[in-house]
Amino acid sequence: MFDIVLYQPEIPPNTGNIIRLCANTGTRLHLVKPLGFSLEDKQLKRAGLDYHEYANMQVHENWEACCAALAGRRMFALTTKGSARHSTIAFQEGDVFVFGPETRGLPEEIRDQFTPEHRVRLPMMPNNRSLNLSNSAAVLLYEAWRQHDFAGAV
C-alpha cells in the first residue's frame, strides 16, 4: 500500500526496527546506498527479529536508481525543514515516504526535489533537533494507514 525509502541509513537498529514495521504493515522498504552497515549486521537482525523474511525490501545503488524504480509515484520527504504537517495531508495508496540519514537528514539537493507541500514535518517541542528515525517512520506510516482504515489488517 505504501513504500518507505531510507536514504543512506547509518544505524543498524533503526533500519531493523523499520524492517519489522514494514513487515507488520505490508509496506515495501527501499534502502539507498551507501549504507552505514552491512545487511548481515547482528544489530540489524536483532532489531528486526525474525521479520526479515516477511519484509519486502529492495536495495538501490543510488538515489537516481531508487527514483527510477518509483517513477510516477507521489513522494514525500520527511524533514525537520518541512512545512506540511503529517496530519493535514490526505495520503493516497501508493504514496512513498523518504527519510534521510540519522545524523544529518536529507541533503538539500534531495530535499529541493520535493515541492514545499511534499516536505513533511512531524510536530515536536521547540528547541529539539529531531525525532528518532524509526519512531518517525512509524508515526507517519500509521497515520497514512489509519486514513485508509488500516486496510488489510486484522
From Swiss-Prot:
Keyword S-adenosyl-L-methionine among record annotations? yes
Q: Show the catalytic activity.
A: cytidine(34) in tRNA + S-adenosyl-L-methionine = 2'-O-methylcytidine(34) in tRNA + S-adenosyl-L-homocysteine + H(+); 5-carboxymethylaminomethyluridine(34) in tRNA(Leu) + S-adenosyl-L-methionine = 5-carboxymethylaminomethyl-2'-O-methyluridine(34) in tRNA(Leu) + S-adenosyl-L-homocysteine + H(+)
E.C. number(s) listed in UniProt = 2.1.1.207
> What's its top-level EC category?
transferase
Q: Where is the protein found, in the record's own terms?
A: Cytoplasm
GO MF terms listed in the record are:
RNA binding; tRNA (5-carboxymethylaminomethyluridine(34)-2'-O)-methyltransferase activity; tRNA (cytidine(34)-2'-O)-methyltransferase activity
* Keywords (A to Z) from UniProt: Cytoplasm, Methyltransferase, S-adenosyl-L-methionine, Transferase, tRNA processing
Q: Which InterPro entries does this UniProt record tie to the protein?
A: Alpha/beta_knot_MTases, SpoU_MeTrfase, TrmL, tRNA_m1G_MTases_N
Instruction: Name the positions where S-adenosyl-L-methionine binds.
Output: 78, 100, 122, 130
Q: What does this protein do?
A: Methylates the ribose at the nucleotide 34 wobble position in the two leucyl isoacceptors tRNA(Leu)(CmAA) and tRNA(Leu)(cmnm5UmAA). Catalyzes the methyl transfer from S-adenosyl-L-methionine to the 2'-OH of the wobble nucleotide.
Q: Which NCBIfam families match?
A: tRNA_yibK_trmL
Subunit structure, per the record? Homodimer.
HAMAP family tied to this protein: tRNA_methyltr_TrmL
Name of the protein this chain belongs to = tRNA (cytidine(34)-2'-O)-methyltransferase
Q: Which gene encodes it?
A: trmL
